[in-house]
Amino acid sequence: LGNIDTLTSQSSLFTFQKYINEKGDSLNYRQLLSDYDNNSKYPLVIFLHGAGERGNDNEAQLKWGVKNFTSDNIMKIHPSIVLAPQCPKNMSWGNFSEDDMSLLPSPTKPMQLLIELVKKTINTMPVDVNRVYITGLSMGGIGTFDAISRYPDLFAAAVPVCGGGDVTKANIIAKIPIWVFHGVRDTTLSAKLSQNMINALIKEGAEPGFTLYPEVGHFSWIAAYSDPMMMEWLYRQHK
């Protein structure tokens, strides 16, 4: 029971929010704030959930990964602003061809709204614009590659977990610090998708991090988000 209580109290640290733009389009999200004062600037972390957590309850997106940002260690040593948006059912973060992972011309509606929300947050909260980070798992890992490929100037670092991306966009994202995680035994999204991105990035002169878990299937996010080295690395990155 103690564990369930802990998880519930971790969730309650995320306030319920809704972004609505001028057209009336909306995106549900949860927001985590460490203790902060307006005289300081704080890193902004965007977390993109996977396909199973889509919906409109503004709750399911906290199921995996993002609650690790509520640990005392992170909140005290690396106070930050964390946004965890929820993608509606039957939509996705990334817009790409299923055949070859090539990026399609326009972002999805949820991605468009997310970028609007990020820009609004930067304008209205004490965000360090040189420390905007994005991470996500599965559908959110693909979304992470999608976001940095479309908006490379926005992000200081990215951590795509069991995702994949468009190898032809490697030149656009080569200067962004990236650490990729994947399970070798993943049958939902092949680890080759991550490997292909890593190879393409290295060809462009980048030095991405790549952690492959030999015995892990699709759930590589459990290990990735509880890796203190990954967290320390993420918060060290800045433009």
Question: Where are the regions that the model predicts?
Answer:
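The conserved beta1-alpha1 loop
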Residues: 48-50, 182
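Short, proline-enriched alpha-helix->beta-strand connector loops that line the catalytic pocket
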Residues: 78-80, 173-178
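Active-site machinery of serine-nucleophile hydrolases
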Residues: 51-111
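Alpha-helical scaffolding within the catalytic cores
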Residues: 63-73, 162-171, 192, 196
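Primarily recognizes the serine-hydrolase "nucleophile elbow" in alpha/beta-hydrolase
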Residues: 119-174
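C-terminal catalytic histidine-bearing segment of alpha/beta-hydrolase fold enzymes
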Residues: 161, 168, 177-239
